[in-house]
Amino acid sequence: MRVVRAGIIGLGEVAQIIHLPILESLNTRFQVTAICDISPMLLAAMGERYRIPASARHTDFRDLVARDDVDVVFVLNSTEYHAECAIAACNAGKHVLIEKPIALTIEDASLIASARDKAGVQVMVGYMRRFAPAFVEAVDEVRNLDRIRYVRVRDIIGHNRLIIEQSSNVLYPDDIPQEAVADRQARNREMTDTAIGEDSGATLRRA
């Protein structure tokens, strides 16, 4: 079986808790060959932890998607950047896994789909419960049943922050470049204006 080479964009909480550990546990099937984040601290820490050479640690996602040793790109950064990164990956001929939600607008989601179709690659939104062991086992059990007359699903939505703090050792960066902070703020203001109208008043936009 050929090992799939993965490039990771975004090294925050979901990458540290879910994606990087799982990819490492599946090391006969996947290899993380490159990582990208705007935080030098996270790049250094995750690079050391997962044995990624310095030459494969990037602060610009365009450098990562252009690499020949990346087959699939994991888009795990903040949602307002999903479309830009995913489209660039598709245009570079890479398959893409995007953390949920796929994008903030239907327009951006459609642009991702168009880039996927044009490039002939696969794009998947990472709703992981479909592949969770409990779900897979439940599907197998249901197949063995005769006629199903009643179905009830119970889900416990807990306090995730408490669980994360007690069970994980997540690194949170304190070295995000100021221009990146300003860019994200500008994008969020633009999204708010799009949602409620630019003439709604400054106080309402800030809310």
Task: Annotate the PLM regions.
Residues Y50-S114:
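Beta-loop-alpha module in the N-terminal Rossmann-like domain of NAD(P)-dependent dehydrogenases
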Residues A103-I176:
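A contiguous active-site-proximal alpha/beta segment in oxidoreductase catalytic domains
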Residues L26-N27, Y50, R67-D68, A132, ...:
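Acidic-histidine catalytic/liganding microenvironments
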Residues F30-A34, A54, D71-V73, V123:
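Short active-site oxyanion
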Residues M1-I52:
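N-terminal Rossmann-like dinucleotide-binding module
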